[in-house]
Structures are given as C-alpha cells and as structure tokens.
C-alpha cells in the first residue's frame, strides 16, 4: 500500500488506525509458528534438501530473479534442481501442476512460467507445497528443491532460508501488516542462512544483488536491440510487478525518455484494452514477467527488458558451498 513507504500526515494516521489489526496479525503469526515448532501443528519434511527464497515484506523485493540465479548456479555445479511455487494468480485445471515452457501464463502463473523458461528446470505449482515436492520427486531425480517464496509457510520444513531485501525501500515504516509491509519483524533475519540486498546494501548483510539489463527484446519478432539504441526516442512503459517504479527508474538510468508510464498491480491479467492509453506509434517497454502475458495481443513495437541477476559477496559463495556439501552427503 502507498502509505507503507511514506511519512506524511495521512500515512501516519492510517498507520495508527490499522495498528490494532497489526498487533492481532503479529500475535497470530507468532503463536502459529510456535505451534509448528512444538509439533502441535504438523509439518512436512522433504527427503531432499529444501531451500526457501522469501522475504519479510510484501511484494517487489526481487525473489524471482534471485531464484533464477540460484538455480543456474546450482546447475553449474551439477546439482539437479526442482522449483516449487504457490503459483499466485494461476488457474490450473488441477494441482499440483507441472509448468511447461510454452504454457499459458493464466494457467501457470507468470513467475513460475518465467522461471521454467529461463532455467529449463522442472517447476511445479500448488497451494500444497508437499504435493508439489512429491510430484517433482516422483517424476524427476531432483537433488534440491527451491521454493520461490514461502518463508512464512511453516507447514513445509526447510534446510536453508534466504531472505531478499529491497535495498531501496527496505522495510518501509517497519510495521507488520496491515499497518506496514512486514509479514514478520526484522529480528527474524537472525535465523536465516543468507540475506541478499537487492540494488543497495542495507546493513543487514554484505551480499548485493544487481539486476542487469543488456537489451530489449521485441515481443513479436524476437529481435534484440541494445537499450542505448532507444535513447533518442520517446518511449512508453508499463509494469505489473510488486514495485513498478524500480523498472521505470532502471530505464531512466539508461538515459531513456519515458513519455508515459503506467503501473499495474502485481500479477496483473492483461488484455489489449489495458494498452489503449498508449500511442501505437511509440515503442512500449515492459518487464519480462509482463511480456509472458502480453504476447498473444502484442504489437510490433512492444519490447520487454530481461534482466540478469548478479549476486556478489563472500557470504553467498560460502552458502553455495555449504548447500552443495549437504547435497553431496545425502546422495
């Protein structure tokens, strides 16, 4: 919500109006996690290691690029990875559901489809993570399961936890939902195995993730152009991600001129009517996540900008070694 990251009078008023509900949310979350720890609520232990990539705050922190980077790193070490996801926004005919690289994003969800297309590993979506893991293990010889999101899904036991922090917004006003963006308080970070800062260091760790765009890809023809080729052309841009402004800022950092921008909600279901606001004579830029949903009605001057995550720091290399060693010992 807009006021989570603002400090004006109306934002402060909304925080205090919602603060009692945040206390209830926090209390229920603490009790629920305690019940799982005491085994009063049952949880599932996978026969192969499980790595959670999650966050403490809601939306737009960079989990999916981090997940793709991690998958590729483990692949380069000869580790067979399977990815599970709740599949937010998906409308599959059944669950668990194995995502195909040419899937309909309405069926698979945008982020699971993007992970499958960028990595080639098996991706399974289901609200029931246990069923997703069991299907992956039944059909693929996975050494490691990576869960895209699910840090607070304590019904699934985990061997490793990674938290991705938005280096620009961090934790907003510091309150838990609904008064603030947090699902859990920052003291939870003391328990995780690795903290990744997206874009800027936050002081919570020295591991930095940079999202690096190299070119724009045409949705219709597949043609690739360097971003600098668009520097003298007025552009339009849309983003249906957790933090759209990050995408717009990235384009402006490459000296691109954005004449019109439009933010949509995360996981937006697009159709051609959403783009009536924009001139068909000007190039329209979007994220790769949005592009997987817009191809069926794309116009010839629509482009998406894929980004490659680059995660730096000694902590991440030590983490990769620890995970690889545990997998080796379990084989």
UniProtKB/Swiss-Prot annotation:
GO-annotated biological processes: lipid A biosynthetic process; lipopolysaccharide core region biosynthetic process
Annotated metabolic or biological route of this protein: Glycolipid biosynthesis; lipid IV(A) biosynthesis; lipid IV(A) from (3R)-3-hydroxytetradecanoyl-[acyl-carrier-protein] and UDP-N-acetyl-alpha-D-glucosamine: step 6/6
Any GO CC annotation of this UniProt entry: plasma membrane
Keywords, alphabetical: ATP-binding, Kinase, Lipid A biosynthesis, Lipid biosynthesis, Lipid metabolism, Nucleotide-binding, Transferase
Reaction it catalyzes: a lipid A disaccharide + ATP = a lipid IVA + ADP + H(+)
UniProt superkingdom: Bacteria
Residues that hold ATP according to the record: 57-64
InterPro entries: LpxK, P-loop_NTPase
EC number: 2.7.1.130
GO function terms (MF aspect): ATP binding; tetraacyldisaccharide 4'-kinase activity
UniProt cross-references to PANTHER family, sorted A to Z: TETRAACYLDISACCHARIDE 4'-KINASE, TETRAACYLDISACCHARIDE 4'-KINASE, MITOCHONDRIAL-RELATED
Physiological role: Transfers the gamma-phosphate of ATP to the 4'-position of a tetraacyldisaccharide 1-phosphate intermediate (termed DS-1-P) to form tetraacyldisaccharide 1,4'-bis-phosphate (lipid IVA).
Stated family: Belongs to the LpxK family.
Protein name: Tetraacyldisaccharide 4'-kinase
Biological source species: Histophilus somni (strain 129Pt) (Haemophilus somnus)
Gene label: lpxK
